[in-house]
């Protein structure tokens, strides 16, 4: 499954923008919708169990990855997955909530007491009476407590009115406030009244009735099972969307897969814009829900259907963009051939499938007549190895931490008196840091390598978790929110690029599905679910502290394993170098043609012998793309050493050139001996080569015999002598002039 060359990066950016915008817009608001549908009856249910359904069900992504790779139906699976996102998740937003009713809570103290006081006509002294003096006559209460229960009211007195009734009052008085009230003493007044009766009625309520809103439990259970069924089916069929998009994006990038972050950043940008705009829109909406009964204070309900409407529109746009993708199944074979030529794609698979002696130059394979098929057992052999298995474990652990922070960070900050404004600022900083991290991820990977990016992510996680665990003021968490980009965005980009370079193109969708299932599915699901259990038993701060220590231990173990793997590779390379057959003698043989060939090939062997291990690693054509690159300071130091070696080599070449000129002048024969120089030269050549190496004596009879019939001029032999000694081995450059000078004197 590969996009054709007509594809443009704008299509990938648009699809990632709409797709990830909708997914991350729907995920946080799903819990709010479940609460509004009646899940308040089950406290904390959305916080602990909802992430499990949304994350663990992402483990279906490997299954759909296998289907897309096996049947070469990548585009069909992608379109069907996006369509399932639209159908199933939009349906959740239109589920009607359960019926609500308002009921009262039984009061814990005495019900209202009505007291009626009748006065008879006549002139007499009337004293103000209080409810507490009669209601609590046995046993008598002290004066301060009585003062708290005396009503503060005025009596309307009129001599011309037949009946005067005091206003009916309901008052709630707390006994603990008795000491703060002013004590009132009974007052006596003389009021002349006619033959009438006055009725005084007062009602005192010790506590106002409390009313709560309850949901119909049967309807809540029905809605819960319905939403659960929709989530399970929808997530199972919609899980491979992100996996296939990531795979197609990586295959479009080709050898520039490190630039995946530049494409992925558009998804984070869309997420931030959508959460900000839709959140403000929902906050400004108010809806009224019918509640049976009276007495309840109507809560302020928000219209969360807006989020699902926006989700449906934007996901439909993503579906339209996905139809513009062109998948070419035949491109698998050409991609494999291209990867073999550049020797950077699948080193592990090539070493295990092909023999070490075969090469593409010796046996070229036509992709149309003899394509290579990689079974799934090769994929499992790769990912189950120590090198890639540890990387996948780190991906799961980072997903575990991200799921825990995503679920319980704001909970912990709320316990520290954090406000919603703080939560908004934290979200903005997190999105900005992710955008920046995705934008520079390829530069960071080129600078330090994939494995060291994982080191940095684990170290930042350790510092972030430990810092949060010791917080006393919620606002000082803001500096650590900047690390969100390094702990999530950079690690995710490095894992995708690293694993993509390790598997053949035909299995990349399956590999990306496994990575997504471990990081986004199982990792974040376990972080949300197990995090809730740990928070209940130990508390939020202690759980953050324990997670920070676990991150530190993971960093140490992972770095130790990678170091041991590097040592084993060096030992294997040394053993292979020892087993390479070396010529018995690199000394040139006494023939003109062989002298010329050896003279041209000797500088290469000399330069190779002077190369350091760092230079060999940099110039190794079999070096995979995922191997950790050298540090910048090592490269600078190596460049300085190279410059120094070049300067020293030029000086040595000048000295050797002067020595060769002097040797030519001293070893040149006199002109009078030209007639008889052919025979002595033929006899002297074996003597010269006999002293040049232990293996050259075996070639003396063979090489000197064909040379004798050829009457070559002395000038040609003299011209070849400097070529033979142009690059002599160490230890052989000085004896040669002495041998050539003493040879004529022996005759």
From Swiss-Prot:
Q: Where is this region: Disordered?
A: 597-625, 652-747
Cellular component GO terms, alphabetical: plasma membrane
Q: Which UniProt keywords apply?
A: Membrane, Transmembrane, Transmembrane helix
Q: Which Pfam families match?
A: MFS_1_like (PF12832)
The cross-references to CDD domains, in alphabetical order and at most eight, read: MFS_MFSD6 (cd17335)
**Main location group:** membrane
Biased region (Low complexity) positions are: 675-685
Specify whether Metal-binding is a keyword of the entry: no
Presence of keyword rRNA-binding = no
Residue ranges annotated as transmembrane are 15-35, 75-95, 222-242, 271-291, 306-326, 391-411, 420-440, 453-470, 485-507, 520-540, 546-566
Ranges annotated as biased composition (Polar residues)? 597-606, 652-668
Where does the UniProt annotation locate this protein? Answer: Membrane
Could you mention a single GO BP entry for this protein?
Answer: antigen processing and presentation of exogenous peptide antigen via MHC class I
InterPro entries per the UniProt record, alphabetical: MFS_assoc_dom (IPR024989), MFS_MFSD6 (IPR051717), MFS_trans_sf (IPR036259)
Family indicated by similarity: Belongs to the major facilitator superfamily. MFSD6 family.
Would you tell me the protein name for this molecule?
Major facilitator superfamily domain-containing protein 6-B
Species this protein is from? Danio rerio (Zebrafish)
């Amino acid at each position: 499954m590969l996009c054709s060359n007509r594809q443009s990066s704008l299509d990938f950016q648009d699809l990632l923008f709409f797709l990830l915008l909708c997914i991350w817009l729907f995920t946080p608001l799903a819990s709010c919708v479940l609460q509004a549908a009646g899940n308040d009856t089950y406290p904390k249910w959305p916080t602990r169990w909802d992430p499990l359904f949304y994350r663990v069900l992402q483990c279906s992504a490997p299954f759909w990855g296998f289907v897309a790779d096996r049947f070469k139906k990548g585009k069909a699976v992608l379109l069907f997955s996006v369509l399932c996102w639209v159908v199933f998740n939009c349906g959740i937003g239109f589920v009607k909530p359960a019926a609500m009713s308002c009921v009262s809570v039984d009061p814990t103290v005495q019900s209202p007491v009505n007291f009626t006081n009748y006065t008879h006509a006549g002139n007499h002294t009337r004293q103000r009476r209080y409810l507490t003096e009669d209601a609590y006559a046995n046993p008598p209460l002290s004066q301060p407590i009585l003062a708290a229960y005396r009503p503060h009211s005025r009596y309307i007195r009129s001599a011309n009115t037949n009946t005067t009734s005091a206003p009916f009052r309901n008052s709630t008085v707390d006994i603990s406030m008795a000491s703060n009230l002013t004590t009132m003493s009974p007052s006596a007044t003389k009021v002349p009244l006619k033959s009438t009766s006055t009725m005084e009625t007062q009602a005192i309520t010790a506590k106002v009735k409390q009313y709560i809103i309850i949901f119909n439990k049967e309807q809540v259970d029905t809605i819960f099972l319905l939403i659960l069924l929709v989530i399970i089916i929808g997530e199972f069929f919609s899980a491979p969307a992100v996996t296939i998009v990531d795979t197609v994006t990586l295959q479009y990038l080709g050898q520039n897969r490190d630039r995946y972050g530049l494409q992925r950043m558009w998804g984070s940008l869309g997420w931030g814009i959508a959460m900000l705009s839709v959140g403000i829109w929902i906050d400004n909406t108010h809806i009224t829900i019918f509640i049976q009964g009276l007495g309840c204070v109507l809560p302020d309900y928000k219209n969360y259907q807006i989020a699902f409407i926006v989700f449906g529109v934007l996901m439909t746009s993503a579906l339209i963009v996905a139809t513009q993708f062109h998948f070419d199944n035949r491109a698998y074979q050409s991609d494999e051939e291209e990867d073999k030529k550049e020797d950077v794609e699948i080193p592990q698979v090539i070493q295990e499938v092909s023999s070490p002696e075969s090469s593409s130059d010796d046996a070229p394979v036509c992709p149309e007549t003899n394509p290579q098929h990689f079974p799934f057992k090769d994929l499992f052999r790769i990912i189950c190895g120590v090198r890639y298995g540890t990387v996948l474990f780190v991906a799961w652990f980072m997903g575990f931490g991200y799921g825990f922070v995503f679920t319980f960070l704001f909970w912990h900050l709320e316990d520290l008196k954090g406000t919603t404004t703080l939560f908004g600022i934290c979200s903005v900083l997190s999105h900005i840091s992710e955008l920046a991290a995705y934008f520079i991820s390829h530069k960071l990977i080129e600078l330090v390598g994939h494995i060291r990016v994982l080191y940095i992510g684990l170290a930042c996680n350790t510092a972030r978790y430990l810092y949060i665990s010791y917080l006393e003021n919620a606002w000082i968490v803001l500096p650590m929110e900047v690390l969100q980009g390094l702990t999530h965005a950079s690690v995710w980009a490095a894992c995708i690029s690293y694993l993509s370079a390790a598997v053949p193109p035909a299995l990349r969708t399956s590999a990306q599905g496994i990575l997504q299932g471990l990081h986004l599915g199982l990792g974040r699901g376990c972080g949300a679910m197990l995090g809730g259990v740990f928070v209940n038993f130990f508390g939020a701060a202690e759980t953050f502290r324990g997670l920070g220590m676990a991150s530190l231990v993971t960093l140490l173990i992972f770095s130790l394993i990678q170091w041991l793997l590097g040592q084993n590779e060096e030992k294997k390379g040394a053993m292979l170098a020892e087993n390479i057959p070396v010529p018995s003698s690199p000394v040139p043989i006494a023939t003109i043609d062989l002298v010329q060939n050896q003279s041209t090939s000797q500088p290469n062997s000399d330069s190779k012998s002077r190369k350091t291990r760092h230079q060999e690693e940099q110039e190794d054509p079999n070096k995979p793309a995922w191997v950790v690159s050298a540090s910048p300071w090592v490269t600078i130091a190596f460049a300085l050493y190279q410059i120094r070696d070049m300067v020293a080599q030029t000086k040595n070449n000048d000295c050797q050139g002067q020595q060769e000129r002097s040797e030519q002048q001293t070893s040149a024969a006199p002109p009078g001996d030209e007639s008889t120089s052919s025979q002595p030269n033929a006899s002297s050549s074996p003597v010269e080569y006999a002293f040049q190496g232990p293996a050259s004596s075996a070639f003396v009879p063979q090489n000197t015999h064909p040379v004798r019939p050829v009457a070559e001029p002395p000038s040609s032999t003299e011209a070849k002598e400097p070529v033979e000694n142009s690059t002599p081995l160490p230890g052989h450059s000085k004896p040669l002039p002495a041998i050539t000078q003493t040879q004529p004197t022996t005759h």
